[in-house]
Amino acid sequence: MNCLFCKIAENKNERLTIFEDDMVVVIMDKFPICDGHLLVISKNHYETIMDVPNDVLTHMFDVAKKYALIDMKVLNETGCSFSINYGTKQEIKHLHLHVMPNYNVKPSKNVEEVYKLIMEGLNEEEKKI
């Protein structure tokens, strides 16, 4: 399979990983539309939200909620948007959930700087990926 997100889920060296378990991986978006823009990516390949089993989708949102709270805390934000694109808006045909604190503000930091802030904000248990 020639799927970018399948490759990302398999290769830890090419991404800024925030969290990983047996169902999902959370990474910094390579092309963020705001500071702290995260992607929660299903490890198994599901092309759309219509294809994913409910337990995986529920888990994706549970993980997104947890890391959105951390993201907002370290960036001093008060709000967050969650988004799953479907159909013509879906650029990569692999299910992923966007987590975007303060969605209306353009990025002011580089991805590595925000990654460092988030990782510093995690407690020791959460750092054990």
Per-region residue spans from a language model:
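HIT superfamily nucleotide-processing domains
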Residues: 1-129
